[in-house]
Amino acid sequence: MTKITVVGAGSWGTALAMVLADNGHDVRIWGNRSELMDEINTKHENSRYLPGITLPSTIVAYSSLEEALVDVNVVLLVVPTKAYREVLQDMKKYVAGPTTWIHASKGIEPGTSKRISEVIEEEIPEDLIKDVVVLSGPSHAEEVGLRQATTVTSAAKRMEAAEEVQDLFMNSYFRVYTNPDIVGVELGGALKNIIALAAGITDGLGLGDNAKAALMTRGLTEIARLGRKMGGNPLTFAGLTGMGDLIVTCTSVHSRNWRAGNMLGKGHSLEEVLESMGMVVEGVRTTKAAHELAEKMEVEMPITAALYDVLFNGNNVKDAVGSLMGRVRKHEVEAIPDLL
């Protein structure tokens, strides 16, 4: 039995805490809403973020980060990307020794455009890091909460670390593969949120299956193009954290990025969308970060650029579609010869 603290009591953090508790681990979960932590402890439910799911009674919730981290050497981080540095700066005051830092957040840090594993390594002293591991893949919290079959990937620079995390999570409904490509796994999970927003817009506009299939396929090309430029393995983007996560996020009503895009496609403003969602829509921030990375690294990402103009420059969604369809003619694979 391993002592694990889950930092972040949203839908995904709560669902992963349930998986770990089902596997017999000593699981604690931290959140900054004391009333929510009380509900988890007394009613064994997170009615705000994972309603209708009865959680294992062995999960203990804390609103004090210091108390949640006592005698723990494995932490699972599931917080919004913009909150990572602040949370990590608090955590390092209470972590006692070498710790395995797992993160399951899908995004890029706003402002720096850094991957989350890079942020962890910057903020946490070396003597407090045993390993940094990424857990990512096609996985809706609502389905994991119902214990429906789900498959994800554990990635780390040291394969033994990825395998240790694989063993922590594996059970009859939650299967984990390993991958040494931490860069590709992180980028696949983050960048697919951009395409999910665009897919939602496509559906909101009623453009049909042909357009959505084209968007997803060309979107994957953009993900792989930037990912390869940043050092990711091209094969990773054809796997669970690339194509797999893209499919589930672009086609399901569970996806908050798809839902946000759908509202944009139906004519709502970005402000209206974000206010109505009530939860973080990582794709919005990731679009800005990816657009900045693409310009800096001179990588062609036309879908990302068009979405950036819709979100941040006030462009009309129909005009964005027209601009993409009117681009100069190209061979399908001419832009990614280094991936073949």
From Swiss-Prot:
Pathway: Membrane lipid metabolism; glycerophospholipid metabolism
Gene3D superfamilies (alphabetical): N-(1-d-carboxylethyl)-l-norvaline Dehydrogenase, domain 2 (1.10.1040.10), NAD(P)-binding Rossmann-like Domain (3.40.50.720)
Compartment(s): Cytoplasm
Cysteine pairings via disulfide bonds: none
The keyword NAD is annotated on this UniProt entry: yes
Active-site residue numbers: K192
Keyword Zinc: no
Protein name as annotated: Glycerol-3-phosphate dehydrogenase [NAD(P)+]
Gene: gpsA
